[in-house]
From Swiss-Prot:
Ranges where the record places region Disordered: 1-24, 54-80, 208-234
Phosphoserine PTM sites in chain numbering: S68, S100, S183, S307
Known function: Anti-apoptotic protein that modulates a caspase-10 dependent mitochondrial caspase-3/9 feedback amplification loop.
One GO BP: apoptotic process
Keyword Ubl conjugation: yes
UniProt KW keywords: Apoptosis, Coiled coil, Isopeptide bond, Phosphoprotein, Ubl conjugation
Species of the source: Mus musculus (Mouse)
Modified-residue entries (Phosphothreonine), positions: T69
Encoding gene, per UniProt annotation: Caap1
Superkingdom of origin organism: Eukaryota
Name of the molecule in the record: Caspase activity and apoptosis inhibitor 1
Cross-link (Glycyl lysine isopeptide (Lys-Gly) (interchain with G-Cter in SUMO2)) at residue(s): K84
């Protein structure tokens, strides 16, 4: 029994060694398997079958390793090829960007440069030059949020529309850095300066016409004043009487009492001395005067009733006699009579003004 056990253990050790050898060197697996298959014992063949299965697993793992290495090598090779093609193109672009005479917007520096104001007559060309100077990238950075979604062509159209609205002077001032509002104010001031001389000339003509009219009216006014000397005396008398009425009713009553008696005596004496013809003429004149006085009194009363807060001086007009010239006594009598009439009228007006 001990001999059989020892032989079995030896076989197991050999099979283990063969398996280890097959893992280390898979090419030796067929040799070992052939040698194992040549033995006549059944136990040895069983051990050899186990060794072949272990060797097949080792081969599969090796194949997987080879595939992974092959795929990694292929990927690395493709990356190397791509870098070979991409690097020269990038280097060329960088080199051209550093050493080219063309800027971002397409401005060729080899061509002689001209100021933007040179193209002011052709607004479309001027706009194109401005866009060439700025460039699309800078333009996109400069644009506000509202216009960020617009294309370059749309922005060009908008700029063209705005340029068409501006005059050449305004464009020059904008290029020089002046504000657009200041330029508008200056143009309005220039227009105002142009209009001002026209207004001044019109005012001068108006002044000349008014001065000539005044010069023409002055002699007429002098003649009318000379012709109405007698009326002015009558008006002054009435004004004095009206002022006395404003001062107080007691003074008016005293003045009326003082002037009424001499007026009556003067009329009586004058009637005895004057002839009949003169008496008739005087009576006609007195009647006319009385009518005029009554009219004036009615006007005074109407004014007093309509506007009691704003008293006005009533003017009594005496029509001058055309044929007969009155004497000095007659004029004095007429003045006294008119005073009495005016005082009575003013007294009546004062009574109307008093509250009931």
């Amino acid at each position: 029994m001990t001999g059989k056990k020892s032989s079995r253990e030896k076989r197991r050790k050999r099979s283990g060694q063969e398996a280890a050898a097959s893992l280390a060197a898979p090419d030796l697996v067929p040799v070992l398997s052939g040698s194992a298959g040549g033995c006549g014992s059944g136990g040895c063949c069983g051990v050899a079958g186990g060794g072949t299965s272990v060797a097949g697993g080792a081969e599969r793992s090796e194949r997987r390793k080879r595939r992974s290495t092959d795929s990694s090598s292929s990927v690395s090779g493709s990356l190397q090829q791509e870098t070979k093609y991409l690097l020269p193109s990038l280097e060329k672009e960088l080199f051209l960007a550093e050493h080219s005479d063309l800027e971002e917007g397409g401005l060729d520096l080899n061509v002689s440069l001209k100021p933007v104001s040179f193209y002011i007559s052709d607004k479309k060309e001027m706009l194109q030059q401005c866009f060439c100077i700025i460039g699309e990238k800078k333009l996109q950075k400069m644009l506000p949020d509202v216009l960020k979604n617009c294309s370059v062509e749309e922005i060009k159209k908008l700029c063209q529309e705005q340029l068409e609205l501006l005059s050449e002077k305004q464009i020059l001032k904008i290029l020089e850095g002046d504000n657009g509002l200041d330029s508008d104010m200056e143009e309005e001031a220039d227009d105002g300066c142009k209009v001002a001389p026209d207004l001044i000339s019109q005012q001068d003509t108006c002044v000349d016409s008014t001065s000539s009219l005044r010069e023409n009216k002055q002699p007429e006014v002098l003649e009318s004043k000379q012709g109405k000397g007698e009326d002015s005396d009558v008006l002054s008398i009435n004004a004095d009487a009206y002022d006395s009425d404003i001062e107080g009713p007691s003074i008016d009553e005293a003045a009326a009492a003082a002037t009424a008696t001499p007026a009556a005596t003067a009329v009586a004496t004058a009637a005895s001395e004057v002839p009949e013809n003169t008496v008739q003429s005087e009576a006609g004149q007195i009647d006319d005067l009385e009518r005029d006085i009554e009219k004036s009194v009615n006007e005074i009363l109407g004014l007093a009733e309509s506007s009691p807060k704003e008293p006005k001086v009533a003017t009594l007009t005496v029509p001058p006699a055309e044929d007969v010239q009155p004497s000095a006594q007659q004029l004095e009598l007429l003045e006294l009579e008119m005073r009495a009439r005016a005082i009575k009228a003013l007294m009546k007006a004062g009574d109307i003004k008093k509250p009931v």
